[in-house]
Amino acid sequence: MDKHGVKTPLWRKEVEDPEAREEDLEDDSSSSSSSSSVEERSDPESATETEEDSRDAEEREARSVSYSPLRQESSSQQVALLRRSDSSFWGWLSPFALLGGLAAPADRKRGAPEEPCVLETRRRPPRRGGCARCEILFCKKCKTLHSHPAYVEHCILEHPDLGKAEATGNSELIDSQPPSPQCSKLFYL
């Protein structure tokens, strides 16, 4: 603790040599013996005055508030300092550590990338031998149904199943038959 009663952080304290401490103790003991002999020679009133003065000073210090802010480094700065001071086996990796900081930090608030429109993506062939032009697809981006531009024309006039029925000449058969399996998915979305 310093004279104001504030704890000093360990990283602020200076390391003293044991030899220097011994020299200080010797200097203190020689100066205290000379000062004690001077005090003995002076009268007792001056000794009590100095004691009272020191007590008054201590009381004033106890009543006063001193502000001594502690300087703290962020954890990233501490890590950087530790990396710089580390000259062991991993010291040769320091160029790679510097390159790691160049990457842009990921934006966690950004959600998943938006899905492209069904019309913009390449579609795979329909299942069970269905007709690609007869498909109606729901687009998550547009939130609507998409179909081929010639959907109606193709399904009514060009569809191979309907063409076979017309070739037989039974128009009643067309009306009474359920839709073919290829086109049935159009009605059950």
From Swiss-Prot:
Descriptive protein name: Uncharacterized protein C17orf50 homolog
Gene source species: Mus musculus (Mouse)
Coiled coil ranges: none
Region spans: Disordered: 1-77
UniProt biased composition (Basic and acidic residues): 1-15
InterPro entries, A to Z: DUF4637 (IPR029174)
One Pfam family named in its UniProt record: DUF4637
Bias-annotated ranges (Polar residues): 65-77
Positions with biased composition (Acidic residues): 16-29, 46-56
